């Protein structure tokens, strides 16, 4: 199955979610057979989970249009960018979702451009402290924690968050176990 096919299934299935906690939405979809333990489909799944939770919490967006745009942006992000480019796709996916919510672009001067950069640098700093190897599930949880804090501080909606233990350890051959803040 191609990344595009996985992305289309993610977008189709995620529209059915009713939660205001993006981590719960993420876990529902991440357990589906078409989502790999690691892979570039997370570049769509992570931001899409945030967008759906935002909409469900009362955020004003055209969800159909937002998910289409997020899928297009996520498909431009290559796999392994964390190791090859030094930036995590989970974090860039959440950053893309924030840009969609705010209508931010490269020439934006309303403060959102800088705010998104601050979100990204804070989240990537946490990942850097934990260190590798990559884990798309752990990295998503760090991105969500920071993304939820950002949404709750900036948008007048409240997304739910609670730190949950990882349910994917047994499927990850490179799990860092005790070094991971989500390890059971």
Predicted regions and their residues:
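Cys/His-rich short segments
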Residues: 1-3, 169-171, 177-184
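Polybasic, low-complexity association/targeting segments
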Residues: 13-47
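Short, hydrophobic/aliphatic alpha-helical segments
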Residues: 22-33, 64-82
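Conserved phosphate/anionic-ligand binding catalytic regions in large, soluble enzymes, centered on
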Residues: 42, 80-96
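Short glycine/serine- and small hydrophobic-enriched flexible loop segments
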Residues: 48-57, 95-103, 145-149
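A structural-propensity feature for long, helix-poor, extended segments
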Residues: 101-102, 106-152
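C-terminal auxiliary extensions adjacent to catalytic cores
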Residues: 151-162, 169-177
């Amino acid at each position: 199955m191609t990344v595009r096919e996985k992305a289309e299934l993610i977008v189709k299935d995620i529209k059915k979610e009713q939660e205001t906690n993006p981590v719960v939405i993420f876990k529902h979809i991440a357990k589906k057979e078409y989502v790999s333990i690691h892979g570039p489909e997370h570049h769509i799944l992570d931001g899409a989970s945030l967008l759906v939770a935002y909409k469900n919490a009362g955020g004003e967006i055209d969800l159909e249009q937002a998910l289409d745009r997020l899928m297009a942006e996520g498909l431009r992000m290559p796999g392994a960018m964390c190791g090859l480019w030094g930036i995590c796709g989970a974090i860039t996916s959440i950053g893309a979702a924030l840009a969609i919510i705010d209508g931010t672009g490269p020439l934006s001067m309303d403060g959102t451009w800088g705010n998104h950069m601050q979100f990204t640098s804070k989240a990537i700093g946490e990942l850097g402290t934990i260190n590798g190897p990559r884990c798309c599930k752990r990295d998503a949880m760090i991105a969500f924690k920071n993304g939820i804090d950002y949404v709750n501080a900036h948008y007048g909606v409240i997304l739910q968050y609670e730190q949950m233990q990882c349910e994917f350890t047994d499927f990850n051959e490179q799990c860092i176990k005790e070094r991971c803040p989500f390890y059971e």
